Amino acid sequence: MSTLLWKDRPIKNLTFGLKRISGRNNQGRITRYHRGGGVKRMGRLIDYKRYIWNIFGFVHRVEYDPKRNSLIALIVYSNGVMSYILAPEGLLVGDCIFAKENIVLKPGNSTYLQHIPIGLKINSIELSENKGAQFIRAAGSYATIISKFEKIVILKLKSGELRRVHSNCMATIGSISNFQYIYRNFRKAGFYRLKGWLPVVRGVAMNPVDHPHGGGQGKTSGGRPSVTPYGVITKGKPTRKNKSAFIVRRRKS
């Protein structure tokens, strides 16, 4: 991936304003603690459906997106249309990309799963036809096709999970860029604040009205097993729903 990121402003018509909700729901109640503040950001309109079909486009530049951990690429198509896509690893400025049935198997090209050979890394995968890319969108992520049966494709995710997807769903060749994201170093508390994270306060340091562990005279242990602010046990209680017809094998924990 090219390290020459665009330093200027994004395309204005492909941006929208982002409103921070600071962890509140539609009733104004806190549903996600330790969120708030942060710098003002502009969202980018990402082409998850790759709706420009059978028309080649060139990578005009690679940009930073403040809303996600992966990089994005500005594509200029031969008909003059511009759009942003999630930049896969290995996509360079000046590369030509396509979205069509029969493509060259190189990063950035997009097609149906039925046309992608077994063993190839893919990203930005649809879960349902014409819904747009819904998973494998985070930095450094990818899935691998391990088998095909009639109109069903079996994908293996990085977590080890095996999942069924219809063969008419779209996917993009390659893995998502910026795999070094997991090695980032925030270095100081101010970086967390700029990202919209607030300090994490212990439950035993709160008042009884704020947390089940709160209150008491002096320092206390909380008096009960560790729970969330809503009283749900935090250590050892399964929270994931196990029923899904599309998951062949669960991820490796």
Curated annotation (Swiss-Prot):
GO cellular component entries: mitochondrial large ribosomal subunit
Annotated localization: Mitochondrion
Record's keyword annotation contains DNA-binding: no
InterPro entries membership: NA-bd_OB-fold (IPR012340), Rib_uL2_dom2 (IPR014722), Ribosomal_uL2 (IPR002171), Ribosomal_uL2_bac/org-type (IPR005880), Ribosomal_uL2_C (IPR022669), Ribosomal_uL2_CS (IPR022671), Ribosomal_uL2_dom3 (IPR014726), Ribosomal_uL2_RNA-bd_dom (IPR022666)
Gene3D superfamilies given in the database record: 2.30.30.30, Nucleic acid-binding proteins, Ribosomal protein L2, domain 3
Keyword Chloroplast: no
SUPFAM superfamilies: Nucleic acid-binding proteins, Translation proteins SH3-like domain
Signal sequence, renumbered to the chain: none
SMART domains for the chain: Ribosomal_L2, Ribosomal_L2_C
Domain of life: Eukaryota
Record-level Gene Ontology MF annotations: RNA binding; structural constituent of ribosome; transferase activity
UniProt keyword terms in alphabetical order: Mitochondrion, Ribonucleoprotein, Ribosomal protein
Annotated region (Disordered), positions in chain: 209-234
PANTHER family noted in UniProt: LARGE RIBOSOMAL SUBUNIT PROTEIN UL2M, RIBOSOMAL PROTEIN L2
Family to which the UniProt record says this protein belongs: Belongs to the universal ribosomal protein uL2 family.
Protein name: Large ribosomal subunit protein uL2m
Source organism of the structure: Acanthamoeba castellanii
Classification of source organism: Eukaryota, Amoebozoa, Discosea, Longamoebia, Centramoebida
The gene coding this protein: RPL2
